[in-house]
């Protein structure tokens, strides 16, 4: 128990390591560069130019940390960067959360890496309801968390301008391209790759967990095969 508590403290569980400026962030993050995990990074959701640039710097450093640990090939780096950028764009645009959270854990013996992104906002259902009330689109048929998660997985976008497919495309990249799995939950709706069902637990906002194996990297993988 003492070891677990020590680990949780090191990764800044449960509150996260606040990313407030690039200098402080890099000083705090430097001690993790040789570790098989990152701290729980806590990014302020603020759509100002400076904060977006800070977010993008953090994502680049985060991916570099993973790549350096497991010698990740450039085609996989591109895929992970696309997924993180797309999910963070969605969180910043729709979640109404004050913060977003990002962390990873490498499992060298299993040759797998897990990446987790979450927020504590209005959730996927709340995002559809907000868009429906604005009369930009009609999502009146989306009533439950399960309805919302199914719609998001199918690529039913809340964006005024269709740009990518968010969860839909990310899921396909991970499950078909990386041969891994993605678990995501919003409210009491839970999805693991193609399976979507009601969960006994309820979470505020959204959580995404990506499990990516790297023991048999597909050199032919290209993110462009999954973009429409």
Descriptions of predicted regions:
Residues 51-85, 109-126:
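A short mid-domain helix/strand-loop element embedded in enzyme catalytic domains
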Residues 83, 95, 104-105, 118-120, ...:
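Short His-Asn-centered micro-motif
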Residues 90-133, 195-197:
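ATP-lid-like helix-loop hinge signature
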Residues 5-10, 127, 194-195:
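A short acidic (Asp/Glu
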Residues 39-72, 132-156, 172:
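Helix-loop-beta hinge of the Bergerat
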Residues 11, 74-109, 167-176:
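Conserved ATP-binding N-box helix of the HATPase_c
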